[in-house]
Amino acid sequence: MALPIIIDCDPGHDDAIALVLSLASPELEVKAITSSAGNQTPEKTLRNVLRMLTLLKRPDIPVAGGAVKPLMRELIIADNVHGESGLDGPALPEPSFAPQSGTAVELMAKTLRESSQPVTIVSTGPQTNVALLLNSHPELHTKIARIVIMGGAMGLGNWTPAAEFNIYVDPEAAEIVFQSGIPVVMAGLDVTHKAQIHAADIERFRAIGNPISTIVAELLDFFMEYHKDEKWGFVGAPLHDPCTIAWLLKPEIFTTVERWVGVETQGKYTQGMTVVDYYFLTGNKPNATVMVDVDRQGFVDLLAERLQYYA
């Protein structure tokens, strides 16, 4: 039986590729997709969800737009990474269908209520929508199997020296998610910076030769440019968000540890930092499964295999 999931995302090149991967995987049943503000403004990320689902011929999936700003802060976006549209690079279709009239939280709550089994929430942007869901619907917590997030880092940040972008945008929301008592799986920079796509991998995807693999290659062509900056020391481009979906499909290609994680919401230098109690110093019980390593080749092979689904 396929695993029911809700995807909350802010497309974003890597979010878009996570959508492609999830919808090429019969093991997963994508019951709803909600958009968050982050990589671009809320209007643009919602439009990008609709454009991707139009491309993938999946207008049957309910879509709703989410919070327009973080819980307690002004919105910051990553247009320097993802371009003016949020998905610069390939020519994507205009949306062929409209989102639902309700909010992301309403769609998530309805989906959870109507599901006969607990649903996994995959969140690849800031945690605002998920935190709002948890706070406004405590009665639905038991309907959530787990929350798989792309966010955080045990080590270095990518937006500040201490903080990863998704968590930095809305640290209060992320703290609500981590302390919710619901199992959390964290794909942070420790693993996503190892899930790099190299130039040869992009050509491998392009050579698959179907319309979707071609678009994915073009998304990666654009995404690669930002990551060529020497300061990162990357060979390729880290494919952050697809790690969440890949973990659901093939957990064996990832190495994980069970640890307590908290989010710094006050720090002068460390706002948005995910504090991972790696050495069990706090006495707090683990609240997260933290990804720390990935078999890069296995990750690339999984993407290549699933891109053939669209032939």
Swiss-Prot record:
The active site is at H240. Keywords: Glycosidase, Hydrolase. GO terms for biological process: nucleobase-containing small molecule interconversion; purine nucleoside catabolic process; pyrimidine nucleobase metabolic process. One of its GO terms (molecular function) is purine nucleosidase activity. InterPro entries: I/U_nuclsd_hydro_CS, Inosine/uridine_hydrolase_dom, IUNH, Pyrim_hydro_RihA, Ribo_hydro-like. Its EC number is 3.2.-.-. Pfam families: IU_nuc_hydro. Gene3D superfamilies: Ribonucleoside hydrolase-like. One of its GO terms (cellular component) is cytosol. SUPFAM superfamilies: Nucleoside hydrolase. Hydrolyzes cytidine or uridine to ribose and cytosine or uracil, respectively. Belongs to the IUNH family. RihA subfamily. HAMAP family: Pyrim_hydro_RihA. This is Pyrimidine-specific ribonucleoside hydrolase RihA.
